Amino acid sequence: MAIELDLQLAVENEEGLPSQQDFQLWLDKTIPLFQPQAEVTIRIVDEKESHALNHEYRGKDKPTNVLSFPFEAPPGMEIDLLGDLIICRQVVEKEAIEQNKPLLAHWAHMVVHGSLHLLGYDHIEDDEAEEMESLETEIMQGMGYEDPYIAEKE
């Protein structure tokens, strides 16, 4: 089975979005480094849905780039469902421009970043952030993209 993707496009305009193959590749280059099989839903949304979910689950009154919802199976239940990623199209596009990054690279970074959250990584504490950012950079560079944090390091 490897990594199974359920891609949901919940946006008014689907033009210019990465392809299903792009999203699959990004998952395939990230998750198998930690576990051999997984099911992941990626839902691409507009700002309204991202804002509502970010407010409900994180108490933040604005849309955000990616939300991660890990699936926690009941004890004793063997299931490959890793969780859901909710990615806001407008926020990703705006950030790519602001950060002077190629749009496809920023989409890839959001999938890698969100996948690491599903796998239990976090960036609340400085040491956790350093470890997570290091993994993100390694994975992104392994796919031929630049360090996603290069602007912050200069």
From Swiss-Prot:
Task: Tell whether Hydrolase is among the UniProt keywords.
Answer: yes
- Under which main EC class is this enzyme filed? hydrolase
* Molecular function GO terms recorded: metalloendopeptidase activity; RNA endonuclease activity; zinc ion binding
| Obligatory cofactor(s) | Zn(2+)
Where along this sequence does the record place binding of Zn(2+)? 113, 117, 123
Residue stretches spanning the membrane: none
Report one GO cellular component. Answer: cytoplasm
This entry's Enzyme Commission designation comes to: 3.1.-.-
UniProt cross-references to Gene3D superfamilies, sorted A to Z: Metalloproteases ('zincins'), catalytic domain
Q: Tell me, which GO biological process terms does this entry list?
A: rRNA processing
Instruction: Name the InterPro entries for this protein.
Output: MetalPrtase_cat_dom_sf_prd, YbeY, YbeY_CS
Q: Which cysteines are joined by disulfide bonds?
A: none
**Do the record's keywords include rRNA processing?**
yes
Quote the record's cofactor note.
Answer: Binds 1 zinc ion.
Q: Which UniProt keywords apply?
A: Cytoplasm, Endonuclease, Hydrolase, Metal-binding, Nuclease, Ribosome biogenesis, rRNA processing, Zinc
The listed locations are: Cytoplasm
Briefly, what is this protein's role? Single strand-specific metallo-endoribonuclease involved in late-stage 70S ribosome quality control and in maturation of the 3' terminus of the 16S rRNA.
- Output the NCBIfam families linked to this UniProt entry: rRNA maturation RNase YbeY (TIGR00043)
The similarity annotation says: Belongs to the endoribonuclease YbeY family.
How is this protein named in the record? Endoribonuclease YbeY
Name its species. Answer: Vibrio parahaemolyticus serotype O3:K6 (strain RIMD 2210633)
Q: What are the leading ranks of the lineage? A: Bacteria, Pseudomonadati, Pseudomonadota, Gammaproteobacteria, Vibrionales
What gene makes this protein?
ybeY
